[in-house]
């Protein structure tokens, strides 16, 4: 169908316009889930606004973890065979549990600022911290097994957010 240009001129078949909540209320959202392969996911998000002063504080965070220790089986249809030494110098086909394939990631962002002031619709400073860790057992092909290879990283991202409608002139 016809799509307004502000949603994307090349949209084929339609578009979905997601309008996020501008966050004018206090809230606390928390979640936790547990799944197979010792998978854990947690999130905590909160916001507090002082209506009189316009001062607000936000916290957003999540943490994910998984052992990824699922069973791997041979699959002749795709010429995929898992072979392990049998102790006599031979290789035998066998189902094996993955090892050294752990994954974890986390993020926390804290923001403080002012809303609805004569000099700013929004003025806020924030700091974001993110970390991740991933172990690798194999590459793209299961035939090459690595020994204790992992990837990890951290980063910090400070930011300043400012918004003022009709800045210096109406409509700007």
Identify what each model region corresponds to.
Residues 29-32, 93-98, 141-150:
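Extracellular loop and loop/strand-boundary signature of outer-membrane beta-barrel proteins
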Residues 74-83, 139-148:
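Flexible, surface-exposed loop regions and adjacent strand-edge segments
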Residues 156-166, 170-172:
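Long, internal scaffold/assembly segments composed of regular secondary structure
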Residues 38-66, 78-133, 158, 164:
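Transmembrane beta-barrel wall of Gram-negative outer-membrane proteins
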Residues 6-8, 24, 36-38, 53, ...:
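Short glycine/serine/proline-enriched coil/turn segments at secondary-structure junctions
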Residues 24, 154-156:
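Hydrophobic helices that insert into or interface with lipid environments
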Residues 8, 67-72:
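Switch/connector loops and helix/strand junctions flanking conserved nucleotide-binding motifs
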Residues 1, 6-33, 40-46:
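N-terminal periplasmic accessory domains that precede
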